[in-house]
Amino acid sequence: MPTTTGTAISDDIYGYNFVTRGAVSWDREVWVGGENKGDSGHGTHVAGTVAAVNNNGVGVCGVAGGTGRNDGVKLMSCQIFSGNDATSGAITTSAEAIKYAADNGAVIIQCSFGSKAGTYTSDSAYERGSGVQYNAIKYFIESQNCDAVDGGVVIFAAGNDATAMSGYPGAYHDYISVTSFSPDYLPAYYTNYGPGCNISAPGGDYKISADAAKTYAEVLSTVPSELSEYNGADYGFMQGTSMACPHVSGVAALGLSYALEKGKKFTLDEFKTMILTSVNDMETYLDGSKTGLVLADYRKKMGTGSIDAYQLLMQVEGTPCLRAKVGTKQLVALTKYFGGSASNLTYLRVEMTRENMDKLGITEAPSISYGKLMIHCTKPGVAKISVTAIAGGGSVGGGSSMGGQEITKEFAVIARATENANGGWL
């Protein structure tokens, strides 16, 4: 898989602490008035969401953790927060880390940090006020460390101020800013939303949890067992757009990995567009209220929708997606894929393996009716299907006969419980 962060300063094999100018730390607790102002495990938690090893029967699965055969995403730990040192979180510290990442093979920078919403309210104000950081990110974007894309991918958390704008740097037009939704697929109570916000991902929301500890509705991931808060545990719960952001970074890593496997190469703008259009709809749910939130306030403000890894992989592959609503026999138009005369073509067959039918709970084989695909999915999921038609005439030519030629399109069917009129699904 592509490297999301690389190495080169002396003694940096396990990453580098750009605050202390030495080894990465994770257990520098600094207690002030009963509150830990030092290391919190935040970065470790984020890293686990991206890259925790899969299929090992332990803990959690990272979005890009691989199959368990040492094929997961590679991470470089560039620590910019450490203890309560004066340079912890400073713009100059992050700028140095970002440039280091570019110089040492990074393809994606996963940035679960940023300024409070409203600190900057325009791109030009951010460029002036945080010029050293802006220039470092520009340098990273212009780096070319992966054969699948011609620049660096920059992904930031939108912020946790419950404010109708993204915080910077995420709000900058060249970067991807990630908002957060909770397990009920509604906006998390804390998430920023509105201008500058590009896409949404799971970030947890303790307020909807029924358990006494109010943690199970948050995101479970890796934490440093040395921190007193976790009592020796290697896994813990956190919430925030910081937790949503690595879901998108992990999906981006999967997409680049798959592009390398398929021998594909995209411009940076093409790849970002693919990420931002690999989404499920959220608008359908934004009615009524939730824990004091007026959901209508979030309409068209959470970004393009909720990130969907499968859709990105299909975009990389070049396989179009057909969306179907669970529980309804429906006709899906094929005009977009077979041309304006799709309804008048002669269709020869629809092919879907029993395994793929089972994935969607299909008991009646899909067919063509009036030039549209008739399909009835009874459970949510994703699966492949192919449709074959004749281009030119009502029969296939060859031998002693004259006729058209077979054309076959493969599709990925995405079945979801809810349909939206704009073609989005969740």
Segments and roles (model prediction):
Residues 328-329, 339-372, 409:
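Surface-exposed or secretory-pathway low-complexity segments enriched in glycine-proline
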Residues 371-384:
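Extracellular/luminal low-complexity segments enriched in Ser/Thr/Pro
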Residues 5-12, 16-21, 167-257:
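Extracellular S/T/G-rich loop segment that most often corresponds to the catalytic His/Ser-adjacent loop
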